[in-house]
C-alpha cells in the first residue's frame, strides 16, 4: 500500500517544523565575572552583604567573601 499524498505532505510539514524549531534555539553564554580583592575592606570577611557594600564604594557592582588560604577575604566582582 503506497502512502497517500496527504500523509507524505503531513510528514514533510512535521519534519520542517522540527528542523525550524531546532534552528531557532541558541545557547546564551553567561557573562564572566572578574574578581579583585577589596582595598578598603578591613578584617575577616564574614558577611558577603557587608563586602558588597564596601565594594560598591570602590565602584564595583557586587562583592562576596571568599576563602584565601586560611582566612576569608572580601573580593569585589564585576562583569569582564
Curated annotation (Swiss-Prot):
Point out the coiled-coil segments of this chain: none
Per the record, GO CC terms? extracellular space
Entries under PANTHER family matching the protein: DEFENSIN-LIKE PROTEIN 1, DEFENSIN-LIKE PROTEIN CAL1
Q: Does the keyword Secreted apply?
A: yes
Consequence when changing residue 74 to A = Decreases the ability to bind cadmium
Applied biotechnology uses: Rice varieties with high CAL1 activity over-accumulate cadmium (Cd) in rice straws, but are not affected by Cd accumulation, or the accumulation of other essential metals in rice grains. These functional characteristics could be used to breed dual-function rice varieties that produce safe grains while remediating paddy soils.
Matching entries from PROSITE patterns are given as: GAMMA_THIONIN
One MF annotation (Gene Ontology) recorded for this entry: metal ion sequestering activity
Q: What does this protein do?
A: Plant defensin-like protein involved in accumulation of cadmium (Cd) in rice leaves. Mediates Cd efflux from cytosol into extracellular spaces via chelation. This drives Cd secretion from xylem parenchyma cells into the xylem vessels, hence lowering Cd levels in cytosol meanwhile promoting Cd translocation from roots to shoots.
Q: What is this protein called?
A: Defensin-like protein CAL1
**Effect ascribed to mutating residue 55 to A:** Decreases the ability to bind cadmium
The effect annotated for residue 80 to A is: No effect on the ability to bind cadmium
Q: What is the effect of changing residue 45 to A?
A: No effect on the ability to bind cadmium
Amino acid at each position: 500500500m503506497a502512502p497517500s499524498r496527504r500523509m507524505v505532505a503531513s510528514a514533510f510539514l512535521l519534519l520542517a517544523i522540527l528542523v525550524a524549531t531546532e534552528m531557532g534555539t541558541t545557547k546564551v553564554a553567561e557573562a564572566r565575572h572578574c574578581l579583585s580583592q577589596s582595598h578598603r575592606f578591613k578584617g575577616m570577611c564574614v558577611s558577603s552583604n557587608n563586602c558588597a557594600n564596601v565594594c560598591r564604594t570602590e565602584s564595583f557592582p557586587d562583592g562576596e567573601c571568599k576563602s584565601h588560604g586560611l582566612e576569608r577575604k572580601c573580593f569585589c566582582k564585576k562583569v569582564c
